[in-house]
């Protein structure tokens, strides 16, 4: 894995599933509920909130910049149209010493997928490494299979190779990183 994108060593990180999960020194992921918590936003010095949903309405605080990415959490939704623009936006906020919160409804699929795209583009991490890192910071992440297919294509665009592949399983096509888990859940 390349240098860790987080500013502090693994043993000092506190993975969070209900609040804001810190991914890098300037990027966080959360649910829609947490994204509307003024205390959480201010205590983490969030300057930009990116809402990756069609169902969550943000409470608009005047000192925070809001970006709307209206994408449903369905395998056919084209989240890939936002990989570059959102990664670029997160990077530009970081260059201005700001902090970004990416959120969707649960902080599991859409926001996680955009986080993985950002880590690949701006931290030169493979998709596998980006997923491993992000999951260590927010254990509940699990982009839907359509987003995985789009991320796999994006990784190939960026690096000319893939570290994650879609494979056949008893429940259909899944990313190979979930293959062992699925096989343990479903007896053959």
Swiss-Prot record:
A biological-process GO annotation: peptidyl-tyrosine dephosphorylation
Alphabetized UniProt keyword annotations: Cytoplasm, Hydrolase, Membrane, Mitochondrion, Mitochondrion inner membrane, Nucleus, Protein phosphatase
Gene Ontology MF, one: protein serine/threonine phosphatase activity
SUPFAM superfamilies named among the record's database cross-references: (Phosphotyrosine protein) phosphatases II (SSF52799)
Gene3D superfamilies, per database record: Protein tyrosine phosphatase superfamily
Keyword Glycoprotein recorded: no
E.C. numbers: 3.1.3.16, 3.1.3.48
List of catalytic residues: 104 (phosphocysteine intermediate)
Topology in the lipid bilayer: Peripheral membrane protein
Family: Belongs to the protein-tyrosine phosphatase family. Non-receptor class dual specificity subfamily.
Job description of the protein: Can dephosphorylate single and diphosphorylated synthetic MAPK peptides, with preference for the phosphotyrosine and diphosphorylated forms over phosphothreonine. In vitro, dephosphorylates p-nitrophenyl phosphate (pNPP).
Protein name stated in the entry: Dual specificity protein phosphatase 18
């Amino acid at each position: 894995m390349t240098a860790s994108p987080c500013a502090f060593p693994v043993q000092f990180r506190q993975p969070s599933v209900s609040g804001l999960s810190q991914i890098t020194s300037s990027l966080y992921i959360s649910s829609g509920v947490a994204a509307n918590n003024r205390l959480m936003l201010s205590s983490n010095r969030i300057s930009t909130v990116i809402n990756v949903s069609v169902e969550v309405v943000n409470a608009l605080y005047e000192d925070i910049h809001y970006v709307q990415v209206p994408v449903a959490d369905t395998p056919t939704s084209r989240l890939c149209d936002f990989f570059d623009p959102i990664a670029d936006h997160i990077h530009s906020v970081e260059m201005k010493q700001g902090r970004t919160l990416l959120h969707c409804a649960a902080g599991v699929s859409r926001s996680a997928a955009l986080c993985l795209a950002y880590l690949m583009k701006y931290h030169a991490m493979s998709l596998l490494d980006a997923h491993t890192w992000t999951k260590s910071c927010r254990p509940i992440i699990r982009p839907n299979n359509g987003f995985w297919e789009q991320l796999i294509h994006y990784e190939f665009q960026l690096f000319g190779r893939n570290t994650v592949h879609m494979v056949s399983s008893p429940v259909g096509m899944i990313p190979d990183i979930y293959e062992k888990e699925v096989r343990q859940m479903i007896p053959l």
